[in-house]
A protein has these predicted regions:
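Residues forming the ATP-binding cleft of Hanks-type serine/threonine protein kinase domains
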Residues: 195
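Active-site activation/catalytic loop segments of kinase-like enzymes and analogous catalytic loops
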Residues: 335-369, 382-400
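Actinobacteria-biased recognition of intrinsically disordered, low-complexity terminal regions
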Residues: 1-2, 237-251, 316, 411-415
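An alpha-helical support segment within catalytic cores of ATP-dependent transferases
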Residues: 106-126, 229-240, 246-301, 369-373
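Active-site acidic catalytic loop and adjacent metal/ATP-binding pocket
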Residues: 36, 135-139, 190, 287-334
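Acyl-group handling in specialized metabolite and lipid biosynthesis
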Residues: 152-157, 202-211, 265-275
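Short, contiguous acidic/charged loop-to-helix segments that flank catalytic cores in large enzymes
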Residues: 156-159, 294-296, 324-330, 343-356
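Phosphate/pyrophosphate-binding loops and the adjoining catalytic core of nucleotide-dependent enzymes
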Residues: 1-188, 192, 200-201, 211-236, ...
């Protein structure tokens, strides 16, 4: 089940616009079998003689498990947001019904007040957007002295933003190099300072990839503070850590089980002909997860992939940690699994040129085995690889290679 162009055209007509050209079209497959489609369009507004062409972003969202979306889930706004007859939600960004803070992007005065600058001195660049989940924008603001300062706005559902701010404050107080929160969250908007360095992911194709000692990552994880009053948040798109379970009895199986369900469903959406293969892999992963010991519950990051680790130019020293949104109590094996799986996926994506990165992944895997159960680690690495193989942006050949890597991860420990 997907969201086709016909639904998009209905939404454009319902908004009173005229569709001229498609500049980008992206499918999002989200936890809970939710779908979203984001289209960057050129549209014509107004009638002949008073018409103007502008670029806008249209979002369509559907939850197949609850097709009859109530109006409360997407309060209609004439010309900006509504619900189609089949229950598909639509809106023009930034009118996301779950992220009210996105309206800040169209209000120069409110943005200036948040950043402490004069109106009109801030330039916004969208860095990422998951409909009904979160958005990240980079802001370059020019001060009275002419100096340009870069900050980031993370836009979340308001209740979640308050929790994330508390988690980040706890992490910072414990010495974890997370971005500083520059102001109390308002309407779900967190203003965050930059962190030094560059994403480790940017170095993975070069010799600097081998410079980071796994012991430095272990030391970073040891700094993570317990946040007992805060259950882990919904894990990131590929995180294997706790997936938002509210009770310990469910947390051990809840996170991996949720990710497995998502990866299996998404694999079938993207490659329907591989349905039997996906079901067999899910059974194998389920058995592997049951065979390993995840270890004690400890503070976890929740989405520790190479893009969330900043390092110095040499790649030797960790200088920053991003997306501590999911900080909470979980299993250390999950943080290691997310990191190692991304390294292995990167090596697979590089093909014949991935030998050096495969060696880096092997080194991290060897270190992780000194801290956590190797069967639990292999099962979770394979699970995250299966999830990475179900990303809509990955070409078919890449999806197939990542699935093969998931199978190989299990085979290494005889699973």
């Amino acid at each position: 089940m997907s969201i086709d162009r016909a639904a998009a055209r209905q939404a454009v007509r319902a908004s009173g616009e005229r569709w001229l050209r498609t500049r980008a079209d992206a499918l999002h497959l989200q936890r809970g079998r939710r779908l979203a489609r984001v289209l960057d369009l050129d549209v014509m507004t107004g009638r002949a003689g008073d018409a103007r062409v502008r670029s806008r972003t249209l979002v369509l969202a559907r939850d197949p498990r609850h097709p009859a979306a109530p109006a409360a889930a997407c309060p209609p706004v004439p010309g900006e947001r509504g619900i189609l007859e089949d229950g598909t939600l639509w809106w023009w960004a930034p009118a996301d019904p779950v992220l009210p803070g996105l309206t800040l992007t169209g209000d120069p005065d409110a943005l200036a007040a948040l950043l402490g600058t004069a109106p009109g001195r801030a330039r916004l660049t969208w860095r990422g957007y998951r409909p009904r989940d979160r958005a990240v924008l980079a802001v370059e603001a020019t001060g009275d002295d002419g100096v340009v300062a870069r900050t980031f706005l993370k836009v979340l559902p308001p209740a979640r933003a308050a929790r994330v701010a508390r988690r980040m404050a706890a992490a910072g107080a414990a010495g974890v190099p997370v971005p500083a929160v520059l102001a109390a969250p308002k309407h779900g908007v967190l203003a965050l300072a930059s962190v030094p360095g560059l994403p480790w992911r940017a170095l993975l194709a070069g010799p600097e990839a081998a410079a980071l000692d796994p012991a430095r990552v272990a030391a970073l994880l040891d700094l993570l503070p317990p946040v007992p009053e805060e259950p882990p948040g919904p894990a990131g798109t590929t995180a294997g850590a706790a997936g938002g379970a509210d009770a310990d009895a469910h947390a051990d199986a809840g996170g991996p089980a949720v990710l497995l369900e998502h990866a299996t469903w998404a694999a079938v959406v993207l490659d329907p002909e591989a349905q039997d293969e996906a079901a067999a892999r899910a059974d194998r992963l389920r058995a592997a997860l049951a065979a390993g010991d995840p270890g004690p519950r400890v503070p976890v990051h929740g989405d520790l992939h190479p893009g969330n680790l900043h390092v110095d130019a040499a790649g030797e020293r960790i200088t920053g940690v991003l997306d501590a949104d999911d900080l909470g109590m979980g299993h250390r094996v999950d943080d290691w699994a997310v990191l190692i799986a991304h390294l292995e996926a990167g090596a697979v994506d590089l093909g014949a040129g991935g030998a050096a990165l495969r060696a880096v992944a092997a080194r991290f895997r060897h270190h992780a085995r000194t801290e956590v159960d190797e069967v639990a680690l292999a099962a979770r690495v394979a699970l995250v690889l299966a999830a990475l193989a179900a990303q809509p942006t990955a070409p078919r050949a890449v999806r197939s290679a990542r699935r093969a890597a998931a199978d190989a991860a299990l085979a290494r420990v005889g699973l």
